[in-house]
């Protein structure tokens, strides 16, 4: 593939999404969603009618076939306007669609994937805990089998969207503590079940994504059929959580950062031509011109790394190093891009009358999501066999 030439169907998808964004996601509405911390499910449902949630679902389950280039392009385009709508898309197409396609049992695929393709099934992630971040294998949330049911007890932290999703895709300890990596399972837990307490956390940015929450499970019962992989998946959750799904999550975050950074550059570029000081637009000043040239260049580098990752994902190859490199470089660079664009706007980049301050708030989380930058550096060094 020529990485410098986007496939025609992806370019057509971009045009469709941009028309949708202009019509259904105008800036004033998006700003209000942000202020109200509101997830507009009606707009999300309209988005799903475009067929974009089918991009991660195999044809035999009602989808259009796995297409990561198109999926990543969808995330990027949506993030140029609304991280909330983009998050809803990720909850459906990626958290549900990609994971179910990769590691679910045949019965689970037949049951759930057609719903994903139609945009009717959203997953939250229940992975992190109050004392568990990067060391996922040390989770303490416990699952005990009781006949045809599983009883769940414990607490998950940084669970995005449980107020709007249908299931929490939850990793639990189902075996003896000593059997690290062989005592974990993944279960699907409906957030509405008795015994579940959802406590929203106040965050700086990422508003309108259904909330970032603590979720506590107190003797919550689910049917055993909700264990991902069925009988074979019990105590085999580690192999599923470290499958290619987590690698792909890295470029999902890269695409989010790329979309936000692109919006920031576009706004700063336009502002520099409209803002008049000393009788001329500020884009005539060399210092501003250099800042804009720099962010444009960095943005292009981010784009290339993001879509290289998407292309590798479409080749169905293990690309852990490349995915970590993309996530590390793109999120850190995109953060620098947005902060530079904020400086171009001066005080206007700090007030809610302009979108720039929202870009800053949303971007600050990107180097943390999907594994922090420090973790990505560890992954890269370890995978490249750098001696410890």
Kindly give the residue locations of the regions a language model identified:
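Glycine-rich phosphate/cofactor-binding loops in nucleotide/flavin-utilizing enzymes
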Residues: 2-3, 73-74, 95, 241-247, ...
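A short, Trp-centered hydrophobic/proline-enriched beta-strand micro-motif
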Residues: 119-127
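A short core secondary-structure module
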Residues: 149, 153-201
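C-terminal helix-coil-helix/basic helical segment that borders enzyme active sites and/or dimer interfaces
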Residues: 28-35, 269, 273-283, 296-329, ...
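A structural signal for short hydrophobic beta-strand segments in well-ordered beta-sheet cores
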Residues: 141-144
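N-terminal glycine-rich flavin-associated loop
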Residues: 87-107, 133-136
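Glycine-rich beta->alpha junctions and the first turn(s) of the following alpha-helix
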Residues: 2-8, 12-13, 80, 198-300, ...
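Amphipathic, small/basic residue-rich leader segments at the start of a protein or domain
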Residues: 1-90, 110-111, 115-118, 384-388
